[in-house]
Curated annotation (Swiss-Prot):
Signal peptide: none annotated. Residues 633-646, 696-722, 988-998, 1069-1081 have a biased composition (Polar residues). Residues 620-631, 1036-1050 have a biased composition (Basic and acidic residues). It comes from Homo sapiens. Pfam families: EST1 (PF10374), EST1_DNA_bind (PF10373). Residues 620-646, 696-794, 890-911, 988-1055, 1069-1089, 1104-1137 are annotated as: Disordered. Keywords: Acetylation, Cytoplasm, Nonsense-mediated mRNA decay, Nucleus, Phosphoprotein, Repeat, TPR repeat. One of its GO terms (biological process) is regulation of dephosphorylation. This is Nonsense-mediated mRNA decay factor SMG7. Part of a complex that contains SMG5, SMG7, PPP2CA, a short isoform of UPF3A (isoform UPF3AS, but not isoform UPF3AL) and phosphorylated UPF1. Interacts with DHX34; the interaction is RNA-independent. Residues 723-770, 999-1025, 1117-1131 have a biased composition (Low complexity). The modification Phosphoserine is found at residues 520, 781, 897. GO terms for molecular function: protein phosphatase 2A binding; telomerase RNA binding; telomeric DNA binding.
Amino acid sequence: MSLQSAQYLRQAEVLKADMTDSKLGPAEVWTSRQALQDLYQKMLVTDLEYALDKKVEQDLWNHAFKNQITTLQGQAKNRANPNRSEVQANLSLFLEAASGFYTQLLQELCTVFNVDLPCRVKSSQLGIISNKQTHTSAIVKPQSSSCSYICQHCLVHLGDIARYRNQTSQAESYYRHAAQLVPSNGQPYNQLAILASSKGDHLTTIFYYCRSIAVKFPFPAASTNLQKALSKALESRDEVKTKWGVSDFIKAFIKFHGHVYLSKSLEKLSPLREKLEEQFKRLLFQKAFNSQQLVHVTVINLFQLHHLRDFSNETEQHTYSQDEQLCWTQLLALFMSFLGILCKCPLQNESQEESYNAYPLPAVKVSMDWLRLRPRVFQEAVVDERQYIWPWLISLLNSFHPHEEDLSSISATPLPEEFELQGFLALRPSFRNLDFSKGHQGITGDKEGQQRRIRQQRLISIGKWIADNQPRLIQCENEVGKLLFITEIPELILEDPSEAKENLILQETSVIESLAADGSPGLKSVLSTSRNLSNNCDTGEKPVVTFKENIKTREVNRDQGRSFPPKEVRRDYSKGITVTKNDGKKDNNKRKTETKKCTLEKLQETGKQNVAVQVKSQTELRKTPVSEARKTPVTQTPTQASNSQFIPIHHPGAFPPLPSRPGFPPPTYVIPPPVAFSMGSGYTFPAGVSVPGTFLQPTAHSPAGNQVQAGKQSHIPYSQQRPSGPGPMNQGPQQSQPPSQQPLTSLPAQPTAQSTSQLQVQALTQQQQSPTKAVPALGKSPPHHSGFQQYQQADASKQLWNPPQVQGPLGKIMPVKQPYYLQTQDPIKLFEPSLQPPVMQQQPLEKKMKPFPMEPYNHNPSEVKVPEFYWDSSYSMADNRSVMAQQANIDRRGKRSPGVFRPEQDPVPRMPFEKSLLEKPSELMSHSSSFLSLTGFSLNQERYPNNSMFNEVYGKNLTSSSKAELSPSMAPQETSLYSLFEGTPWSPSLPASSDHSTPASQSPHSSNPSSLPSSPPTHNHNSVPFSNFGPIGTPDNRDRRTADRWKTDKPAMGGFGIDYLSATSSSESSWHQASTPSGTWTGHGPSMEDSSAVLMESLKSIWSSSMMHPGPSALEQLLMQQKQKQQRGQGTMNPPH
């Protein structure tokens, strides 16, 4: 077989030469590139070992894809290039093709080598009936490690491609799947660090660079990248404030490690360490950190300790320089001090509920694991100087009520923090007896309680080990099966943490002062003081810091009765955008006096919230490209209702259930409110005004990132994609919901038409009262927005799940054009059938959908009935299908009457791509339905959101299970797919920046994947902390090749685009999309780029249907198709030319 492979290699060299031959035209180069891809794919499939020896996989990426991507990016970045928009379109198409190639290659590798990856989508889910392999006898069977490597390679490059397309949430999903597949390989961690860096989350950036280095196979570029990041931190000014916020602490913490890692200015270590210890204690007692941040801080310390001294062979004597000894001493002192404070923190809060007390315990567990592996550390002088740690540890262990059987009950089930640290060299021996293959499936029943108990048992076991080996520190007595830890060391009494409450007030009042100071880009601004301190008395929240990518879901509110998100205005200083609340003026006034209003009782209530301190700069400086919010709900509030979960990085149990894993519980869904509110003012922007993308960006996203946006398809030129059309869940400015908005899962699932009208009218009344309240957000629009006619989506034309509902004056409901096969109905009747179907439409499509806030519209919670459990079987797809079909047809036929859906606005030129993309609702439905099949979720799973294993990983049962919990005052927030510690985001959220919103060529992280972005990203990060991680086979909302490749001709509109799918795969998302176009369509006059948008949309369908192997004839097909459309008289469907 090697002879044939050698022949393939020779052919590949010829093709590579052709691709670089300047004499050949684009068509010849394209043909050579396609041939090279096919050739390398054959080699990888038939003789993988030989191909890997020859680095075929690297040549495939570099020559067939990366070089061309880099070339197109360079051309598109040149603003003087007259063909810039065409280059961006070509880049978009090429990235689409590259993603399709690697998806198909991964699928073929899994099939040929019979690799059953947790992230793999079975062929049956893709509509492939059989996988007959020809020439199977010619395939050389590779080693399993080689199979894992090549699959990880595909996943990493799929993540890179998604990152170039600014689909950061999808990129993160690919990287995490890759890291889970081979935890000992450092490359996926490096890529995750790049994503974190692009968002400005430096804690997560440093954490993942450390993870990328401290593995068996470190990624070479990670060390350089870490040095750059730490050097940039050292360049920032020193903090002079006496009382730090969490962002100040993290900034100083990173500087401390910069001094140690780079051995610079070591004289600053000791005073900086003392300040860190002091502020860490104060902030921890304020509950300002979340579990994830504490573990990341601990792991960074362990990485540095491991880096300074290799304990692999403790029998050898090593000599260390004076600087090395100084760094070691200061770092070990910091580590031990932090450990003592972590042990003391739960004891200081004995009145708190037990589950909350566990929030520092994961970091304690990680720290104790390391000490157990390094017994010589107990002899260090800095450890002896901190003997006050051991009485606190003893008190903590005794609070677990240890029994003798705890020492013998050995569980191989990994805890979430152990999943997070798979392959981490500093702790690797501690994890050798754990079984990572089952994910969290080893625990059934009360996962939260069992995991808490497992952690306690492991801590008790470590305590017993210390008692056996260091009796001078700890002794253990056995009293009739009960263990009692004792020590002769006196316990150090700390001051009452009431000072922390005072500090909280001071911290809140200083927030406004620090807003201006932290507005500059760079590490300083990124790590600026947490602006999202809950100034709102109602929330009872703590100030909290978050790192943008690191934290997807915010720390949950422990007190469900006080789950109001903080109400404040989020500003993007770099873009001049202010995202205002819907109840803006009232809440703006409240913000000025909230601190004064907070009583001591409220502060005590605040003390009960485990809040991840969220850096306000998350919204200010993250600069997420504007359209990601459509994928990710905007939930910036650190303490939302206790449905928040967060994301372990890589373990099989953390990924959405797939058909290949029937045992996985279904994911959690939050049913959106059946009534869509109009969110914006009634103001119509003039045609020449460029509206910031924040007004155009919907919040919700679908499972696994495959939300098919109404009015948005994949092949729109990047220059047209930033001001994207509304997503299926949103309308108007709500897409960038400020944290002040209340989740609205408490809306009745089937309200009467009357209540619907009331709520709508109430929303309209607010609009009319302040018709221009969103106008201050106009500020400056990013430069690349200027080419578009943007508008504010202020009315019901964006109501995607209830398109027929029009917002008119009270008692005035505009009639909707009826489908030809429906009898005429009273328009008010149209509301009633439309209320129920959208619930099921959204349920499967919006895993982490943020329900619409209710407080701004209905201030009397008693007016809204609490729904029955929204996963009730009454929401059967079969029950609603006919009504949804009517709804969809109504939508389609009513969508071209702007007067109906925009009664309060003058026609505004629509963006050209919206027009072209809404021409084929059936195509949208086809995409959506095929996407659902990719996710692998069955209808049963979609209907039972309460069973997700991710609910139960850490913390409370995050899915509300009673009517009371769904009341407006405690409306649960959506849950993330990946949950670790209760309420605290665990692994980096990398808050999905907007996919497709920035031209790939302009992305700050679109160049070399291993390079650290030297400057903050230029795109606008709206607060979209959630990320959607679907099965790897699941394309992002623009990866639609799978849908199109099954059909050449799109079904007619009446066919709903599901003619080729089975009933199971054509689940609710297809129906959801059927009703989408009416919500986003408004016919307006021609615009400059209409024709190009239509061309791109048509070319996309041709491209995709040809199995991602486009040839030079694609343009000819496109022209033919355009001519046929005009001849068929589809003038109303196409934008005017």
